[in-house]
Every structure is written in C-alpha cells, then in structure tokens.
A protein has these predicted regions:
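Tandem CBS (Cystathionine beta-synthase) repeat/Bateman regulatory domains
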Residues: 1-154
Length: 154
C-alpha cells in the first residue's frame, strides 16, 4: 500500500470489482440527438452524464457541467441543437484492470466526475465519482469491522 500523487491510498481494488457490483449498463445517445432529449434522459435516470456514441464508438461525453456551461453561454435555444455541439470530445477512459485509486487520481487531476470503461474498442461500463466514493466508504467500513474483531480477539 502506498500513497498516490493526489494523496489517495493505493489499493488493489479494480474498476472491474465496481462494475461487477453496479452492473455494466451503458446509457448513450447518438451524435444527432437533441440536447433537450439528453437532458430528459439525465433527469429521468437521475444520472450526471451520458456517453455520445456513433456506430458503437465513443465520440464524446455529455455531462451536467457541459449543459450548464452552454446554457449560461448561449441560452435555452441551445436545447434544440445536437449533443455533438455541446459534448466534451476529448474523452478520458480507463480499463477494468485499473485500480480504484488510479481512477480517483485521474478524476481528481482531470476535474471530471465520469469515466468510461473501455476494453479494446468496446465500452463495458461507466464509472462515476459517486461509485468510487461508495466503494471507499464500504472499504473503510470493512476495515473498521476487521479492526474491531482484531481488538476483541487480542
């Protein structure tokens, strides 16, 4: 165990373990989808981002932050435009074999909250900062329980 550059404790827990728990569901919209339809999807599913896909490939990611930014800059008329005009095009992704600590560091340094999980050319999941925080809380709860048991038997 060691500390990463952002101060996160490095462990061997991988992205695969989170996906195995939360599932591999991937919500996406096509490039030509209207921003208003994507906003509706985010609201209905209570999620913060959706992948923008074309023929099975990631073309971008659309987050709540992207939407708020463009609404502030250009007003409500942007809701009639295609998501391709608003999405983030430079998508950072991870692999299932990446450690949770490594993706925490990626998210912190990159200042983003969602990370597509890609194996080869195939998208296999989407990890959010909420997923990571949930895992970290569970990890600490397990550690505390193990310490309590150790103290009882000492």
């Amino acid at each position: 165990m060691f500390w990463g550059a952002t101060g996160f404790r490095e462990t061997t827990m991988t992205v695969r373990a989170i996906l195995d728990t939360k599932g591999h569901n991937i919500l996406s919209v096509p490039l030509e989808a209207k921003l208003s339809a994507a906003v509706k999807l985010l609201a209905e599913r209570k999620i913060g981002a959706v992948l923008v896909m074309n023929s099975g490939r990631i073309e971008g990611i659309l987050s709540e932050r992207d939407i708020v930014r463009v609404l502030g800059e250009r007003g409500a008329s942007v809701l009639d435009e295609a998501v391709s005009t608003v999405m983030t095009r430079k998508v950072v992704s991870c692999k299932q074999s990446d450690t949770v600590a490594a993706i925490m560091e990626m998210m912190t340094l990159g200042k983003f909250r969602h990370l597509p999980v890609v194996e080869g050319e195939r998208v296999v999941g989407l990890i959010s900062i909420g997923d990571v925080v949930k895992w970290r809380v569970q990890e600490y709860e397990h550690e505390q329980e193990a310490l309590r048991e150790y103290i009882k038997t000492a």
